[in-house]
């Protein structure tokens, strides 16, 4: 399907992922091996946690399940299944991480195994304990528990360095003293091989001496790097003597000033997997070209008796590509720092902390991950698939309430002045066991401004002069007139009601009307701040354009980006096909209004979810909602309003 235009693929995917799977949860321990020097690690067969949620989607078909099933059938790992989720603690998790979390913890749970939470804390310039705490909280929020299996790459710094010295003594690594520009010049290209640098043939003794002096802090940042000696002519750039250690005189948030020599990810994560006895190392497709290096490092160490067999295997799956959002850390940081959003937990942000405030649910993310499946090829998922999944989950679980967002006054002229009564409405129309609540009705009501029209358009079945509608869960009313202010705006709608038509009473449905509107008693309604959130961007691919064109092309996909390591520094590929993604911000992505809600909502607490009847799904804000100040955020509308928008 990847050959199809993006717009066609999006329409196909929106129709495809609408099944509703069942749910399971499993838990079982697995063994764990580490060298003697890492004495604080759990011993083999120590009990640990797997997915501990009661709402994990049931297994569906994907290639990773088939691989694990085959390994289990062949006893490749003795029946063990150990996965891991290894985020770098340099930012907040986003929607794409949710897919990986659900996948890794879910596969472990399905097979009675464990999933490790490991922080890849190898770059002290960017990492902080704040991010670690947020990441751990987000994983727990999604419904998963790593038990005793919470680790850090820095747990293994001593062992990693010991292995680095071993690579040097075996003639498999050397200290390179070239500058970053010099390394780049000798690296070669995708079509031309690299050339050996002047320091590639240093003696073992000289390399070992330099490496130990690097560790001792004798050299400045960038003076030397440690590289593996593999093959400068390899067609795979990652195998052209990759850098595995760099000098950085920077305090680490866990190890303090103990180290000024830090390992790089490609060297660290494969060894960490092997130390933790991970069986299936699952990552996204951009690491596919790194797999030969992954295998080379741990295979050499196993051959040297430094790691146990069987070794972990790396498998790649397609990352989440979602329309109408950006997931790049650089772009997300720009949105925050430039004030385009109200922080990392802004409900419009595709971060998990933002999703939580938006009202997206853990069960919704798990269901979304199951619906979109696991693929080996990149494709785009339309935002409507995620939104529809959240609607399905919220529709099944949230109670109903009434809220008037744009109120005008309605007076029932034949209703006794000063009196009121209780009408009753189900908390959930499909779940009678959730009971019902009382809603007070009186002479003066609030209704939505759009539910009255002086001159109605064709097909309008709500309130108009002389027309009848039913007050939801109440009476049938007939419009007898209306008042306007000096500017010609309708201020009050006047009606009469039929006492014989009260909902739920005998004969109430004898007279049928097409219109049905919601309302609130003016005397009893509770004011609330309502934040109407929508998509942050107004186009599917923010910033995308055809090369040389200054306007976005229909269905155009963003230019691919990647990073390589030169002399220990990550270098991003130029995004020369992008224009400014900020030009595509949606100016209507946030609107704050003062509305009225039914009295029952005065008792709502933060993170309570509701369907505001006829409006959509809302949540009491995690941060700002309190008994003195009711604040509700719109999660999603009742129906997809974007599919009909132009462009």
Across the structure, where does each feature detected by a protein language model lie?
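N-terminal Rossmann-like or analogous alpha/beta NTP/dinucleotide-binding catalytic cores
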Residues: 21-23, 28-196, 259, 286-314, ...
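Glycine- and acidic
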Residues: 82-90, 115-122, 274-282, 346-352, ...
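Long, charged, mostly alpha-helical binding arms that flank functional sites
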Residues: 309-389
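Acidic, Ala/Val/Gly-enriched low-complexity intrinsically disordered segments
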Residues: 6-8, 24, 559
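Core subunits and conserved enzymes of cellular information-processing
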Residues: 291, 295-297, 370-373, 380-647
């Amino acid at each position: 399907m990847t050959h199809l235009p993006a717009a066609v693929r999006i329409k196909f995917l929106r129709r495809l992922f609408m099944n509703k799977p069942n749910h399971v949860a499993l838990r079982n321990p697995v063994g764990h091996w580490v060298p003697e020097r890492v004495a604080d690690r759990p011993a083999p067969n120590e009990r640990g946690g797997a997915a501990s949620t009661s709402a994990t989607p049931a297994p569906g078909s994907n290639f990773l399940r088939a691989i694990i099933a085959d390994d289990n059938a062949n006893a490749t790992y003795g029946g063990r299944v150990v996965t891991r989720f290894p985020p770098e603690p340099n930012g907040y998790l986003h929607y794409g991480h949710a897919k990986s979390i659900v996948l890794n913890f879910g596969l472990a749970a399905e097979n009675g195994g464990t999933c490790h939470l490991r922080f890849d804390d190898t770059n002290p310039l960017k990492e902080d304990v704040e991010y670690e705490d947020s990441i751990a909280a987000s994983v727990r929020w999604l419904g998963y528990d790593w038990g005793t299996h919470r680790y850090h790459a820095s747990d293994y710094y001593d062992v990693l360095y010991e292995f680095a010295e071993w690579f040097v003594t075996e003639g498999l690594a050397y200290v390179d003293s070239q500058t970053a520009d010099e390394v780049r010049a000798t690296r070669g290209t995708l079509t031309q091989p690299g050339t050996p640098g002047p320091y590639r043939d240093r003696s073992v003794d000289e390399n070992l001496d330099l490496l130990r002096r690097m560790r001792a802090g004798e050299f400045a940042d960038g003076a030397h790097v440690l590289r593996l000696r593999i093959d400068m002519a390899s067609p795979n750039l990652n195998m052209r003597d990759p850098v595995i250690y760099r000098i950085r005189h920077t305090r680490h948030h866990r190890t303090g000033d103990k180290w000024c020599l830090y390992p790089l990810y490609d060297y660290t994560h494969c060894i960490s997997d092997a130390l933790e006895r991970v069986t299936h190392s699952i990552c996204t497709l951009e690491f596919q070209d790194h797999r030969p290096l992954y295998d080379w490092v741990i295979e050499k160490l196993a051959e040297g008796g430094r790691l146990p067999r069987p070794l972990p295997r790396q498998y790649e799956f397609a990352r989440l590509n979602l329309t109408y959002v950006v997931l790049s850390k650089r772009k997300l940081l720009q949105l925050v720092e430039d004030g385009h959003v109200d922080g990392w937990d802004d409900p419009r942000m595709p971060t998990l902390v933002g999703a939580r405030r938006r009202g997206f649910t853990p069960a919704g993310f798990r269901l979304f991950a199951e619906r979109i499946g696991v693929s080996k090829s990149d494709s785009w998922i339309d935002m409507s698939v995620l939104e529809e999944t959240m609607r399905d989950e919220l529709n099944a679980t949230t109670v109903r309430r009434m809220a008037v967002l744009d109120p005008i006054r309605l007076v029932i002229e034949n209703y006794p002045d000063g009196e009121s009564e209780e009408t009753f409405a189900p908390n959930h129309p499909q779940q009678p066991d959730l009971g019902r609540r009382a809603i007070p009705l009186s002479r003066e009501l609030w209704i939505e401004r759009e539910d009255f029209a002086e001159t109605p358009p064709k097909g309008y079945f709500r309130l108009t002069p002389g027309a009848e509608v039913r007050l939801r869960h109440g009476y049938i009313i007939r419009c007898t007139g209306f008042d306007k202010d000096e500017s010609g705006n309708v201020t009050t709608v006047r009606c009469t009601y039929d006492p014989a038509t009260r909902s739920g009473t005998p004969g109430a449905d004898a007279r049928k009307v097409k219109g049905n509107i919601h309302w609130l008693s003016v005397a009893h309604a509770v004011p609330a701040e309502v934040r109407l959130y929508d998509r942050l961007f107004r186009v599917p691919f923010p910033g995308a354009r055809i090369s040389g064109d200054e306007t976005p092309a229909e269905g155009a996909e963003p230019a691919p980006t990647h990073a390589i390591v030169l002399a220990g520094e990550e270098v991003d590929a130029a995004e020369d096909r992008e224009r400014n993604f900020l030009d595509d911000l949606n100016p209507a992505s946030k609107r704050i209004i003062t509305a009225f809600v039914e009295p029952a909502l005065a008792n709502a607490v933060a993170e309570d979810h509701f369907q505001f009847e006829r409006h959509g799904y809302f949540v009491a804000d995690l941060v700002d909602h309190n008994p003195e100040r009711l604040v509700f955020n719109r999660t999603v509308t009742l129906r997809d309003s974007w599919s009909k928008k132009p462009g």
